[in-house]
Design a protein with these regions (language model features):
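Active-site environment of non-heme Fe oxygenases that use a 2-His-1-carboxylate facial triad
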Residues: 101, 107-133, 137-143, 148-149, ...
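Motif-centric detector for short Cys/His coordination patterns
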Residues: 1-127, 131
């Protein structure tokens, strides 16, 4: 039950209840502000409602049988509310006008002349300002290359300082990629790797991947990266029905060896509630056989074929040779990666590990706070 008592008194301006449980605030300078009543009660900043030490909420709306306002008042810079039941709240005007959503660098599609940004590994690790710039670039483009990194195994463990803890997956914490006749994955052959992201067979695939080249004496085997989200936005405009199919139809993915198995059945494209792309899950090598009797299978394959043709003929690909001592970092829910054919048997050793995008964004927040 929502009740607002309309009251005028000296020094106060009138507040009128609106439909949908809002109250209209008329500020002395003429600005009007419409505020949800339940929201007002929920965000009361007083120490009885919020833990000052942690800024967590102490009060819970569910403890009130009804919510009603007895009196309200405004000054130039604050709103006062006296709630039925005896509680009072004071809200700074700046708090009521603020967009409280966290602002992060927005992803940007690659320009026609885009090339990955290179940062020095030691500077990235030791210099907070350099790390801040590098992470901002990573959140915009989805790609970062670190140069002059050590070529010792397990160097990727050091990135936890900037990227957060390694995301553990089955198989190996740090994965070794060499040509290996006993390998369980196509990456262990000299074959080219088509565009993909790793572990599509997880319901939540790792969202950041770091690929560290320890040694690269082989010819061929250039690295490839693809701006998957930019491609999908073009596909959404050109083929909206096919795009919707790829958001709706679940696809089975599986990766396994003699000791472990991962399996997920998920759409290739996942959107958030705003319709924005949040995951592009693409791995032709891990995709499993779909049921041909399911009517969705035919429409899925029509859409999948159209998307794949567009991907393989796309100008969204960048090719480069990853040298020993370089680390390629990709936002793997957005950027697909691959590899051209390795032409000879020269020694080539790469290690990769996984991290989480949330933890990278956390590091940006921490670094930005220290440089305000």
């Amino acid at each position: 039950m929502l009740v607002v008592a309309e009251e005028n008194h000296a020094g106060c301006h009138s507040m009128n209840a609106e439909a949908l449980g809002n109250v209209q605030v008329n500020w002395p300078d003429g600005e009007r502000m419409s505020l949800p009543i339940l929201w007002l009660r929920d965000v009361c900043p007083c120490e009885a409602c919020r833990i000052a030490q942690t800024q967590e909420k102490r009060f819970h709306l569910a403890t009130l049988e009804t919510v009603s306002i007895e009196t309200l008042g405004v000054s130039d810079e604050a709103l006062w509310v006296a709630w039925t039941g005896g509680h009072s709240s004071q809200y700074p005007r700046s708090f009521l006008a603020k967009d409280h959503a966290r602002v992060m660098p927005q992803w940007q599609p690659w320009s026609d002349d885009y090339t990955p940004a290179y940062f020095d590994f030691q500077a990235f690790q030791a210099n907070d300002r350099m790390a801040l710039l590098a992470i901002e670039e990573f959140l915009r483009s989805g790609v970062l290359i670190l140069s002059n990194a050590p070529t010792e195994e397990a160097t990727l463990e050091l990135l936890a300082k900037r990227l957060g803890p390694i995301r553990e997956v089955l198989f190996e914490r740090i994965h070794n990629v060499k040509v290996d006749p006993r390998g369980y994955n196509v990456a262990h052959t000299n074959l080219g790797l088509p565009p993909h992201n790793d572990f599509a067979s997880y319901s939540w695939p790792p969202s950041v991947q770091a690929l560290h080249m320890l040694a690269n004496e082989a010819s061929g085997g250039r690295s490839t990266i693809f701006d998957g989200w930019a491609l999908l936005e073009e596909f959404r405009s050109a083929e909206p029905e096919a795009f919707d199919v790829l958001c709706r139809v679940e696809v089975p993915f599986r990766e396994f060896d003699e000791s472990n198995e991962t399996y997920a059945c998920e759409p290739i494209i996942r959107l958030n509630t705003k319709g924005e792309i949040v995951i592009f899950r693409y791995s032709n090598q891990l995709m499993q056989v779909m049921n041909p009797a399911d009517p969705d299978t035919a429409v899925f394959y029509d859409a999948y074929y159209k998307l794949s043709r567009r991907l393989f003929s796309s100008d969204k690909v960048r090719r480069f040779r990853l040298e020993g001592g370089q680390i390629l970092i990709v936002a793997s829910h957005r950027v697909l990666h691959g590899r051209e054919v390795i032409d000879d048997a020269g020694y080539r050793h790469l290690q990769d590990a996984y991290f989480e995008h949330d933890n990278v964004r956390n590091m940006l927040t921490v670094l930005a706070r220290s440089h305000d």
